[in-house]
Amino acid sequence: YIGMQWTPFARWKLSAYADVFRFPWLKYGVDAPSTGKEYMLQLDYTPSRNLSVYVRYKYKQRENITPYHQQRLRMQALYTISSSVSLRTSADGICYTEANEKSRGWMIAQSVGWKPVDVPVQTDFHIAGFHTDNYRTRISSYEKNILYAFNMPSFYGKGVRLALSFRWDIVKQLSVSAKLGYTYYADRDVVGTDLEEIEGNIKADIYTLLRWKF
């Protein structure tokens, strides 16, 4: 493994790493010796205090029972409108190749964060549209969750994802957090499998947390 960071000019930063590995023995999920490599290249640009942009490319290759390679491209812009409002816009693309068969996918997302200075409340709204060929080209959705919970759900197929998170610090010791997620699938009539199977093409999820600090 080797990694580097380089700042060629003010407000520009280039990051990269290369990871080449080999597992001579069996491991979880792989019943034969395997090898692989992974590369990442990211360019960050911060033209002002209120705006930051980055472009990231990742390449992954695995040589095991069924060799494959995967390419991912992500672009994101974070813009602070004021001391209380911020925007995050992102676009993701993926290409997965296995046995000379290619599958692709993309996701475009927009988040709006609101955290007023003089009110102990903060909210975040997230909307994303996605279209991928199959499960292998699933794409993670970068959305906020309730306190102490980091949730990065992945989606595949064709649909729209909406998420709204909320936190209210009622008093210094007491706070309440909640999140409502809504996913619409345009390419299926059943969502999930086994015990999590849902009839229909809509899935909703709710998270809540009440915290009391002593």
Regions found by a protein language model. Name each.
Residues 1-214:
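Exposed, low-structure sequence patches enriched in small/polar residues
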